[in-house]
Amino acid sequence: MSSQIKQVFARQILDSRGNPTVEVDVVLESGAFGRAAVPSGASTGIREALELRDGNKALFIGKSVYKAVENVNTKIAQAVKGLDALDQRLIDKTMIELDGSENKKNLGANAILGVSLATARAAASHLRKPFYRYLMDVKEYLMPVPMMNVINGGSHADNNVDMQEFMIVPAGFDTFSEALRCGTEVFHTLKKVLIADGYSVAGVGDEGGYAPDLPSNEAAIEAILKAVKEAGYEPGKHVFIALDPASSEFYKDGKYELKSENKSLTTEEMIDYYAAWVEKYPIVSIEDGLAEEDWAGWKLLTEKLGNKVQLVGDDLFVTNPSILAKGIEKGIANSILIKLNQIGTLTETFEAMAMAGQAGYTCVVSHRSGETSDTIIADLAVATCSGQIKTGSLSRSDRIAKYNQLLRIEEELGENAIYPGIKAFVFNSDEEVEEVVQEIIVEDSEAEKVVVQVEE
């Protein structure tokens, strides 16, 4: 039977914050079916593809997405019906050209992405392949090392913590399932530690982490490391720390305003702030350590810490190949966060990952703070062998859904599932270390290629 697109239909559903989002169904002539739901961010980069919302305050406080849904059911459906779902590049190119804008503001990135992902899922169903294997069909796959957001602050929580995410990284294990077990044990132990120290854990943040008021940002790290030890693990051996300060959120008039500590820091002082932490704690990754507009500062940050820790650009690069290219040229950061809805199509996401891999940058596949039960990013992380994933804490079913999908994939792959551990975090070393870099070529559709570099 034919793999041509027969039907495209969108609806408005709710995300994990109770806000409207777009869900799309695609049916092929063969009867194969694909569905995808689109996530949404809280702290968003200024150069992200545009998420189209209606702005009618009488409906969902202005956050409804009926126009995006209408765009899928009319303009986009008419444009892609009859196209071959196995040709992902053509599907995405058709929608990009139909939109005609640089940031997908006319049709909405949420409309376009929903169709892009649902089509890919339908194509996988047509070929009777698991989604990750449809994206890349090889013998062995890298299971991603999870960054688990156990303390939430900033825009993700209603507390006094300036920095947005304090994450545990269970990299000192042989399998993903062992790492996940460690993460859950540390997460539950952290609750006991926070309560014992007099902090409230009555609620959790958008991504499922605890959201206590703390005397300082550093207190979050201290509490986490205490929990790691009390759970029976060794910091720097079994469990490491990753940070996402989301610095654009507290960057005001050229200064970094840490209100919880009553500090107003220059770029150089902010870099020194991080450098002291890197020397003191087992930190392996810092995401958005400086503001997205502070490119000169990013250059200084990379020069000072780029050979010691992974420096991830999220708001900085917004999964955009053209912006990433500028960063690579200027020697800024050494890693990129991959968020599908920042760029709006699967094809462009692959292009960004390919560019990053060819430049020696790592890729971290990521969720958004406004998530759904959709598990596509779990399959994407495995398919591209990115080696890293951010999908929240060990609570809230929208986060757990991704971890459970990774457990299923690891079980299915058996001995062909490789957990890279600390080797997933690639950055230059002061020591002369011989590195073996494996290039995995991912064939997507007829022409798409993703190159992912993995240190062995």
Swiss-Prot record:
InterPro entries listed in its UniProt record: Enolase (IPR000941), Enolase-like_C_sf (IPR036849), Enolase-like_N (IPR029017), Enolase_C (IPR020810), Enolase_CS (IPR020809), Enolase_N (IPR020811)
Record's keyword terms, sorted: Cytoplasm, Glycolysis, Lyase, Magnesium, Metal-binding, Secreted
Gene3D superfamilies (UniProt xref): Enolase-like C-terminal domain (3.20.20.120), Enolase-like, N-terminal domain (3.30.390.10)
Pathway(s) per entry: Carbohydrate degradation; glycolysis; pyruvate from D-glyceraldehyde 3-phosphate: step 4/5
Highest taxon in the source lineage: Bacteria
Subcellular location: Cytoplasm; Secreted; Cell surface
BP-aspect Gene Ontology terms: glycolytic process
GO cellular component terms, A-Z: cell surface; extracellular region; phosphopyruvate hydratase complex
Amino acids binding Mg(2+): 244, 287, 314
Matching SMART domains: Enolase_C, Enolase_N
Annotated catalytic residues: 207, 339
A GO molecular-function annotation: phosphopyruvate hydratase activity
Catalytic activity, as annotated: (2R)-2-phosphoglycerate = phosphoenolpyruvate + H2O
Cofactor(s), by name: Mg(2+)
Entry EC number(s): 4.2.1.11
Main EC class the enzyme belongs to: lyase
Binding note for cofactor: Binds a second Mg(2+) ion via substrate during catalysis.
Residues annotated to bind (2R)-2-phosphoglycerate: 164, 339, 368-369, 390
Disulfide bonds: none
Subunit and interaction comment: Component of the RNA degradosome, a multiprotein complex involved in RNA processing and mRNA degradation.
Functional summary from the UniProt entry: Catalyzes the reversible conversion of 2-phosphoglycerate (2-PG) into phosphoenolpyruvate (PEP). It is essential for the degradation of carbohydrates via glycolysis.
HAMAP family to which the protein is assigned, alphabetical: Enolase
Matching NCBIfam families: eno
Membership in a protein family: Belongs to the enolase family.
Protein known as: Enolase
Species this protein is from: Francisella tularensis subsp. holarctica (strain LVS)
